[in-house]
Amino acid sequence: MLGSSAVFAGGFQLNEHGARSMAQAGAFTARAYDASAVYFNPAGLAFQQQNSVYFGSTFISPEIDFYGPSNLGSNKKTSMKNQVFTPIHAYVKYGITEDIHFGFGVYNAFGLGTEWDPAWDGRRISIKANLQTFYFSPTLAYKVNDQLSIGAGMNIIRDPIFYICVNWCENMILHGSFFV
């Protein structure tokens, strides 16, 4: 017989690319009900009959506590600094012809961070990390027939990412990149 202690997730995932995406916990790739298809499935834009503009934001204020051994061997509680994140999403869908459709999106695929007291026990791993990317995504969709469409897009990513720790890890500041 095996046993384990409690396990808690410590990662992050953003599904704030549209209201339906959030409601379906990100299980939205095969759907194309609105202009957020720019992010999930550009080919789906070809099946949308009307031009549209779609935008929004989400308020995220995480509260995280770390319980770990202190120098004296007891479990010490350290709380992360309170922060507010507001990932955005904005999409435009425009039908050029009946079969060719253009989409453009601006959104945060990642938009969270952490900040701890510089004297906390995990300071050699991380004091501050920030991953807030801005995606600019032009897309095209072509409706082949009533059951098939194809789509393509490009992501231009602005990623002001930084990571700070104490002593043995290297502090990193990464600036914008271009990916296709």
Q: Where are the predicted features?
A:
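Subset of outer-membrane beta-barrel
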Residues: 8-180
